[in-house]
A protein has these predicted regions:
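Cyclophilin-like peptidyl-prolyl cis-trans isomerases
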Residues: 1-154
Length: 154
Protein backbone atom coordinates (compact mmCIF):
# COMPACT_ATOMS: atom_id res chain seq x y z
CA UNK A 1 0.00 0.00 0.00
CA UNK A 2 1.70 3.17 -1.16
CA UNK A 3 -0.52 5.88 0.36
CA UNK A 4 -2.85 4.92 3.25
CA UNK A 5 -4.66 8.27 3.00
CA UNK A 6 -5.69 7.41 -0.57
CA UNK A 7 -6.34 3.70 -0.08
CA UNK A 8 -9.91 2.54 0.52
CA UNK A 9 -10.60 -0.89 1.99
CA UNK A 10 -13.98 -2.44 1.26
CA UNK A 11 -14.95 -5.47 3.31
CA UNK A 12 -17.66 -7.00 1.13
CA UNK A 13 -19.84 -10.05 1.58
CA UNK A 14 -17.49 -11.72 -0.95
CA UNK A 15 -14.20 -10.62 0.68
CA UNK A 16 -11.80 -7.70 0.85
CA UNK A 17 -11.33 -5.25 -2.02
CA UNK A 18 -8.57 -2.61 -1.87
CA UNK A 19 -8.91 0.50 -4.02
CA UNK A 20 -6.13 2.97 -4.77
CA UNK A 21 -7.72 6.41 -5.06
CA UNK A 22 -6.30 8.78 -7.67
CA UNK A 23 -6.65 12.39 -6.46
CA UNK A 24 -4.47 13.60 -9.33
CA UNK A 25 -7.21 12.45 -11.73
CA UNK A 26 -10.31 13.56 -9.82
CA UNK A 27 -9.56 15.54 -6.65
CA UNK A 28 -13.17 16.50 -5.94
CA UNK A 29 -14.44 12.94 -6.37
CA UNK A 30 -11.71 11.46 -4.19
CA UNK A 31 -12.38 14.04 -1.45
CA UNK A 32 -16.13 13.28 -1.55
CA UNK A 33 -15.68 9.50 -1.46
CA UNK A 34 -13.24 9.79 1.46
CA UNK A 35 -15.70 11.97 3.40
CA UNK A 36 -18.53 9.50 2.75
CA UNK A 37 -16.33 6.56 3.80
CA UNK A 38 -15.36 8.34 7.02
CA UNK A 39 -19.04 9.12 7.72
CA UNK A 40 -19.89 5.40 7.39
CA UNK A 41 -22.11 6.10 4.37
CA UNK A 42 -21.08 2.96 2.45
CA UNK A 43 -21.38 0.51 5.38
CA UNK A 44 -24.14 -1.97 4.55
CA UNK A 45 -24.75 -0.59 1.03
CA UNK A 46 -25.54 -3.24 -1.61
CA UNK A 47 -24.25 -3.79 -5.14
CA UNK A 48 -27.59 -3.00 -6.79
CA UNK A 49 -26.63 -3.20 -10.48
CA UNK A 50 -24.16 -5.86 -11.58
CA UNK A 51 -23.80 -6.66 -15.28
CA UNK A 52 -21.68 -9.66 -16.27
CA UNK A 53 -18.69 -8.66 -18.40
CA UNK A 54 -19.26 -4.98 -17.62
CA UNK A 55 -19.38 -3.67 -14.05
CA UNK A 56 -20.63 -3.82 -10.44
CA UNK A 57 -22.36 -0.65 -9.20
CA UNK A 58 -22.92 0.38 -5.58
CA UNK A 59 -23.37 3.49 -3.45
CA UNK A 60 -27.16 3.93 -3.42
CA UNK A 61 -28.56 4.12 0.13
CA UNK A 62 -31.92 2.79 -1.14
CA UNK A 63 -30.36 -0.18 -2.96
CA UNK A 64 -32.22 0.76 -6.15
CA UNK A 65 -29.89 3.13 -7.99
CA UNK A 66 -32.19 6.09 -7.31
CA UNK A 67 -30.48 7.61 -4.27
CA UNK A 68 -27.30 9.25 -3.13
CA UNK A 69 -25.83 11.55 -0.52
CA UNK A 70 -27.73 14.52 -1.94
CA UNK A 71 -24.56 16.38 -2.93
CA UNK A 72 -23.90 16.45 -6.68
CA UNK A 73 -20.36 16.57 -8.02
CA UNK A 74 -19.01 18.49 -10.99
CA UNK A 75 -17.64 16.05 -13.59
CA UNK A 76 -13.87 15.53 -13.59
CA UNK A 77 -13.56 13.54 -16.82
CA UNK A 78 -9.99 12.46 -17.49
CA UNK A 79 -7.96 10.40 -19.93
CA UNK A 80 -7.71 7.34 -17.67
CA UNK A 81 -9.22 4.37 -19.55
CA UNK A 82 -12.05 2.20 -18.25
CA UNK A 83 -10.32 -1.19 -18.02
CA UNK A 84 -10.63 -4.19 -15.71
CA UNK A 85 -10.40 -2.93 -12.11
CA UNK A 86 -11.14 0.72 -12.89
CA UNK A 87 -13.31 2.49 -10.30
CA UNK A 88 -15.46 5.26 -11.78
CA UNK A 89 -18.35 7.46 -10.71
CA UNK A 90 -21.88 6.60 -11.80
CA UNK A 91 -24.09 9.46 -12.94
CA UNK A 92 -27.38 10.26 -14.63
CA UNK A 93 -27.61 11.90 -18.07
CA UNK A 94 -26.30 15.22 -16.72
CA UNK A 95 -22.47 15.04 -16.61
CA UNK A 96 -22.50 16.90 -13.27
CA UNK A 97 -24.91 14.48 -11.55
CA UNK A 98 -22.39 12.14 -9.87
CA UNK A 99 -23.03 11.79 -6.13
CA UNK A 100 -22.19 8.67 -4.09
CA UNK A 101 -22.70 5.82 -6.57
CA UNK A 102 -19.66 4.27 -8.21
CA UNK A 103 -18.83 1.19 -10.23
CA UNK A 104 -15.96 -1.24 -10.65
CA UNK A 105 -15.27 -2.52 -14.17
CA UNK A 106 -15.11 -6.30 -14.66
CA UNK A 107 -13.64 -5.83 -18.12
CA UNK A 108 -12.54 -3.14 -20.57
CA UNK A 109 -15.29 -0.58 -21.20
CA UNK A 110 -13.68 1.97 -23.52
CA UNK A 111 -17.08 3.31 -24.58
CA UNK A 112 -17.20 5.04 -21.14
CA UNK A 113 -13.87 6.82 -21.59
CA UNK A 114 -14.01 10.63 -21.26
CA UNK A 115 -17.70 10.43 -20.26
CA UNK A 116 -17.43 9.15 -16.67
CA UNK A 117 -15.03 10.24 -13.93
CA UNK A 118 -12.37 7.62 -13.15
CA UNK A 119 -11.14 8.11 -9.57
CA UNK A 120 -9.41 4.85 -8.66
CA UNK A 121 -8.47 1.26 -9.38
CA UNK A 122 -8.67 -2.05 -7.57
CA UNK A 123 -5.19 -3.10 -6.42
CA UNK A 124 -6.20 -6.16 -4.37
CA UNK A 125 -9.25 -8.40 -4.29
CA UNK A 126 -10.45 -8.23 -7.89
CA UNK A 127 -11.21 -11.95 -7.53
CA UNK A 128 -13.75 -10.94 -4.86
CA UNK A 129 -15.32 -8.35 -7.18
CA UNK A 130 -15.65 -11.15 -9.76
CA UNK A 131 -17.74 -13.15 -7.24
CA UNK A 132 -20.38 -10.42 -6.74
CA UNK A 133 -23.86 -11.68 -7.63
CA UNK A 134 -25.12 -10.44 -11.02
CA UNK A 135 -28.46 -8.85 -11.82
CA UNK A 136 -30.27 -5.67 -12.77
CA UNK A 137 -31.71 -5.45 -10.19
CA UNK A 138 -29.81 -8.04 -8.17
CA UNK A 139 -31.94 -10.46 -6.16
CA UNK A 140 -30.53 -10.87 -2.61
CA UNK A 141 -27.52 -8.67 -3.49
CA UNK A 142 -24.00 -8.75 -2.10
CA UNK A 143 -23.00 -5.73 -0.05
CA UNK A 144 -20.23 -3.59 1.35
CA UNK A 145 -20.07 -4.73 4.98
CA UNK A 146 -17.73 -1.85 5.83
CA UNK A 147 -15.65 0.76 4.03
CA UNK A 148 -12.61 2.36 5.62
CA UNK A 149 -9.65 4.46 4.62
CA UNK A 150 -6.42 2.53 5.28
CA UNK A 151 -5.08 5.53 7.23
CA UNK A 152 -7.96 5.09 9.71
CA UNK A 153 -7.85 1.28 9.97
CA UNK A 154 -6.13 0.07 13.11
Amino acid sequence: MTDPENTMILETSKGRVVIEMRPELAPGHVARIKALVRDGFYDGIVFHRVIDGFMAQTGCPHGTGTGGSGQKLKAEFNREPHVRGTVSMARAQNPDSGDSQFFICFDDAGFLDNQYTVWGRVTEGMENVDKIKRGEPVQNPDKIVSAKMAADAA
